[in-house]
From Swiss-Prot:
It comes from Arabidopsis thaliana. SMART domains: Cyt-b5. The lineage of its organism: Eukaryota, Viridiplantae, Streptophyta, Embryophyta, Tracheophyta. This is Cytochrome B5-like protein. Residues 26-36 have a biased composition (Basic and acidic residues). GO terms for molecular function: heme binding; metal ion binding. Disulfide bonds: none annotated. Residues 24-49 are annotated as: Disordered. Heme binds at H81, H104. It is found in: Membrane.
Length: 121
């Protein structure tokens, strides 16, 4: 008799947890649907820079470059650059050709995104 009551009690507790979990998932799904249908107010758009704005950032301690019409602030990377001061050859200017040169490992294509600050207009 005690075993039957124990099994029944275990079944009821399990059922309660299952019902609560389903209810929580349903609420989460409803919240996702609501939030995806609401207009997004805080869309972050990339900043836009002119070539002349980028051009003033042409020093070791203030170094921006352009790669395929995207602007990158690489100031914090200049001292780490394995190619030394070659990175400064196009500081404040378009560095697309140099960036895609044979001297760069493919990992630079992932790394560069960490320095992205906007688009060229």
């Amino acid at each position: 008799m005690i075993a039957v009551i124990g099994l029944l009690l275990g079944f009821l507790v399990s059922a309660l947890f299952l019902i609560q979990g389903k209810r929580r998932r349903t609420n989460d799904n409803q919240e996702k649907k609501r939030s995806s249908s609401e207009p997004v107010e805080d869309v972050v758009r990339p900043k836009s820079y002119s070539k002349s704005e980028v051009a003033v950032h042409n020093k070791r301690n203030d170094c921006w470059i352009i790669i395929k019409d995207k602007v990158y602030d690489i100031t914090s990377y200049v001292e780490e650059h394995p190619g030394g001061d070659a990175i400064l050859d196009h500081a404040g200017d378009d560095s697309t050709d140099g960036f895609f040169g044979p001297q760069h490992a493919t990992r630079v294509f992932d790394m560069i995104e960490d320095f992205y600050i906007g688009e060229l207009h």
